Amino acid sequence: MRVLLASDDSGSLKEIIFNRGTNTSIKTALQPFHIDIHLNQGLSNRIDKIYHVSDSLLLLARHSGSLELVSSKRVSKDVDETNEPKYDVTEFELQDLISGLFDQSVLDTLSSKSKKKSKIEDQFVELYLIKKSAKNPIFLAATKSGNVTIIEVDLHSTKISKIASHKIKAPVEFVTLYDLDKSDKFVMAYGGEENLVRLIELSSDFKEISDIWAAKNVPFDNIGLRVPAWDVALRFLESEKNGVYNFITITKYAQLRKYSTNAEDCRPVKSITLLPKGEQLNSCKIIGDTSPLGNFQSSNFDELEFLAADSRKDVYQFNGKGRLLRKIAKGDITGFASCIAVTDKYLLQGGLDRYVRIFDLADYKLLAKIFTGGKVSDIILLEDNDLELPLTEKQLKMKKKKEAKRSIVEADEDAENEDLWNKLESKKRKVSKNDI
């Protein structure tokens, strides 16, 4: 298996090559074949997001407000063939960058008006493909300060250019694109702390952006107090009616909210408390039948299942009715799971405890656990095949014994076959003489 991850402490990209069963917390377990650091720029310039553009290109969104286009090239690793498997490693090189995509002043203004003491720090919250192209794919990058930047990547010249930029209301936790139909429309939803969900439409040339719908908060609670609004993640569902958008949000306060833009009052059609003890959630990843951007390919809220991480150390699996199905790796994760990523087969998890873990989505069995030396902000899986390991001395001896035993058995079988053949030939000759 091969993963790339963003390591905060060194501000680097790390490549790890390993097999299933790898566990660096157990000395006698299988260990990684390769861990290497690339493009390290320190904590203040750490990587917020990674996007795998092609087999030879990556986009990196850095905490300094820059987007980097990085080329990758596989080269053979020099190994002792008697002790290690053969594999290639990756070399990375910066090709182009765009900087100045943050607006810290917006967040400083919000912080000055807030009762909270902590400063809100700008960062990239989204980086994804919005328009495919064999030559010039288009990407969206969004920041907590509300900057939405549309980027074009020239695959031939390995250059990136900014083709449009827009401002939306801050602070922003997510900007989710609706990708469940083949429409030319670019409909997106965004929201954040005291920033209720809004749906916006981006024009086909990416130059104009317009509001099309805005959510209202849930009613006051049973003692007449306003309920805080802080959606941290949103995923769309399919719609059975043209122009109507259905979606779920996860709130910081561990609520699952179901919305339909067809609802008359623009409030959630349902709100469910997921965790009863005041745990705070930070993410939502739908598992099962999803679009390339992780939206749910069904219109039935009750059919979905999703993963969510809290702000302490737990990762949970829930169904669409808000029922807790399981805790993932209960007791093993010891720090905030700052990153969870889902593929069609695997759950990738990393965080404050500096480990990256790979789970099988079929049964949530831990496949690998690797200490990375830094807080993990993003992970992508490049390969899921295992390397063929050279045989140990004990295995070689066993193999030779089996081969020797097989040779003896084959020799005995050949002798028996020869004897049987001779008997048959002798019988044929006797029959022929009698016929004469």
Swiss-Prot record:
InterPro entries found in the cross-reference section: WD40_repeat_dom_sf, WDR74/Nsa1
Keywords tagged on the record: Nucleus, Ribosome biogenesis, rRNA processing
Record's keyword annotation contains Hydrolase: no
Annotated Gene Ontology cellular component terms: nucleolus; preribosome, large subunit precursor
Keyword Disulfide bond carried by entry: no
Compartments (UniProt record): Nucleus, Nucleolus
SUPFAM superfamilies, alphabetized: WD40 repeat-like
Gene Ontology terms describing biological process: ribosomal large subunit biogenesis; rRNA processing
Annotated function: Involved in the biogenesis of the 60S ribosomal subunit.
Subunit structure: Component of the pre-66S ribosomal particle.
Family named by the database record: Belongs to the NSA1 family.
Official protein name in the record: Ribosome biogenesis protein NSA1
Species, as recorded: Kluyveromyces lactis (strain ATCC 8585 / CBS 2359 / DSM 70799 / NBRC 1267 / NRRL Y-1140 / WM37)
